């Protein structure tokens, strides 16, 4: 494209910028990850994080997330969020709960309460926090805090889709609460080009542990 006329300089600059945006967007790929369990069946509630090897990607907190307590269970059982995201632990049961976590990623305690706590809990460090109830031992939930904007939680078919992944080399971390104790997840290398990418991951895990009946 040639632009000589001074009167068209602004229009040409705008068009060049727009084309640059389009070209930049076209270089971002969609990464699809299929997660299966030890038996080869689709594994829901698996967490996938992509971390760039060459650069620290900017990440922002999410809007307030709710983890509810109903029928003496946490819902959702696995929650994926980014660093700095506040979480409200709403109690919809007719009994009071005592919600806590002693995990290094986030230690907190919400003593016996009903309804909605006065303040949310801000998860300000990356990692996995196991949440329980000091009154009802069968209750358990997992809060996974990501320090990357490239993340996803597998659906009922074990599928994760991560959009806008720039070309480059990444560390892919896959985790599930059904992994053996003391397992920190599975880490592998992933190279992303300009084309969309599909990856399959099998974990030595079964479905997420279900809360036992009270």
Question: What is each stretch, according to the model?
Answer:
Residues 13-24:
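Bacterial N-terminal signal peptides
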Residues 2-15:
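Bacterial N-terminal signal peptides that target proteins for export
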Residues 28-159, 163-214:
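Extracytoplasmic copper-binding redox domains, predominantly the cupredoxin/blue-copper superfamily
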């Amino acid at each position: 494209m040639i632009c000589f006329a001074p009167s068209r300089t602004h229009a040409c600059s705008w068009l060049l910028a727009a084309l640059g945006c389009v070209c930049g967007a076209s270089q971002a790929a969609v990464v699809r990850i299929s997660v299966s369990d030890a038996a080869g069946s689709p594994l829901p509630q698996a967490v996938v994080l992509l971390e760039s090897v060459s650069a620290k990607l900017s990440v922002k907190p999410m809007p307030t997330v709710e983890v509810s307590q109903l029928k003496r269970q946490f819902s959702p059982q696995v929650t994926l969020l980014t660093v700095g995201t506040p979480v409200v632990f709403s109690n919809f049961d007719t009994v009071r709960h005592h919600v806590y976590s002693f995990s290094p990623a986030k230690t907190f305690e919400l003593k016996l309460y009903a309804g909605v706590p006065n303040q949310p809990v801000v998860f300000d460090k990356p990692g996995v926090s196991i949440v329980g109830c000091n009154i009802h031992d069968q209750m358990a939930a997992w809060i996974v805090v990501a320090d990357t904007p490239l993340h996803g939680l597998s659906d009922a078919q074990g599928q994760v889709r991560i959009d806008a992944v720039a070309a480059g080399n990444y560390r892919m971390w896959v985790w599930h609460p059904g992994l053996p104790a003391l397992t920190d997840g599975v880490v592998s290398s992933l190279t992303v080009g300009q084309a969309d990418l599909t990856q399959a991951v099998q974990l030595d895990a079964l479905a997420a542990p279900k809360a036992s009946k009270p």
